[in-house]
Design a protein with these regions (language model features):
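Extracytoplasmic/secreted cell-surface and envelope-processing proteins
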Residues: 23-27, 65-68, 95-98, 131-135, ...
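An active-site-proximal structural segment forming one wall of the substrate-binding cleft
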Residues: 1-13, 33-49, 72-78, 146-147
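Glycoside hydrolase catalytic-domain groove-lining segments
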Residues: 85-133
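Aromatic-lined carbohydrate-recognition surfaces of secreted/lumenal glycan-active proteins
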Residues: 38, 42-71, 119-132, 154-160
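Active-site groove signature of glycoside hydrolases
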Residues: 2-31, 53-62, 86
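Substrate-binding cleft of secreted/luminal carbohydrate-active enzymes
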Residues: 12-13, 120-209
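Cell-envelope and extracellular/periplasmic
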Residues: 18-19, 27, 61, 79-81, ...
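Alpha-helical scaffolding within the catalytic cores
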Residues: 1-2, 62-78, 100-114, 136-145
């Protein structure tokens, strides 16, 4: 039923079972069965005609935790036939993580996902800075992605705070916020999504009830 609704609402970017290489997810630690489950899901969606209208995003965390070979993100990859886009959660490691300074920023954190597939488009499916990094440097690298990593076609800033992950809000750092406002003026970035997109999806949601 969910697959049929997704087909009717399309196009949407669908990111199921993300961050599978992180120990905080219930499906972490078993790459073999993860791949089997993903392929089964994709095959069902294909049979229902969903894959022709929607984008399936396979989206690990930028850093595998634990960082063992058995838990490497590549082990969870179901194959190019079963994935449309690559996604990645892109955050600085926590204060307790023993990563050097240059491993805490977008351009470096992107390197792992690039190795999984040679030509799939990439999106930062969620990301943002934290107290463990230089906020202005993070913002600068965020906007450099379009020039230095041309496969990156979309970015999503997770603008929130909580006790576990700290304050990731842009407005928490006035200097970083002003830099963001300046850099986002580049016409490359979408300003507004047309109202028709919202109204069309809302209509379809109402019709599916």
């Amino acid at each position: 039923v969910a697959a049929q609704k997704a087909r009717d609402m399309g196009p949407i970017w669908f990111r199921p079972a993300n961050e599978m290489n992180g120990s905080w997810t219930p499906y972490y630690g078993d790459p073999t069965n993860y791949v089997k489950a993903w392929r089964r899901m994709y095959n069902i969606a294909e049979q229902l005609g969903v894959t022709a209208y929607n984008v399936f995003v396979w989206s690990p965390n930028s850093v595998s935790m634990p960082g063992t070979e058995a838990n490497a993100m590549k082990n969870y990859y179901p194959g190019d036939m079963y994935v449309d886009w690559l996604g990645v959660s892109c955050y600085p490691p926590s204060l307790s993580a023993t990563y050097p300074e240059d491993r805490r920023y977008p351009l470096t954190l992107m390197q792992g996902i690039k190795q999984v597939s040679a030509d799939k488009p990439i999106m930062i499916s969620e990301g943002g800075y934290s107290s463990t990094c230089d906020h202005q440097r993070w913002v600068r690298e965020w906007f450099k992605l379009k020039d230095e990593e041309p496969r990156v076609k979309a970015v999503v800033w997770e603008n929130h705070e909580n006790a576990e992950n700290g304050d990731r809000r842009l407005q928490s750092d006035p200097l970083a916020l002003e830099l963001y406002k300046e850099l986002v003026q580049d016409p490359y970035w979408l300003d507004l999504i047309p109202d028709a997109v919202y109204s069309e999806i809302e209509t379809r949601k109402n019709n599916s009830k």
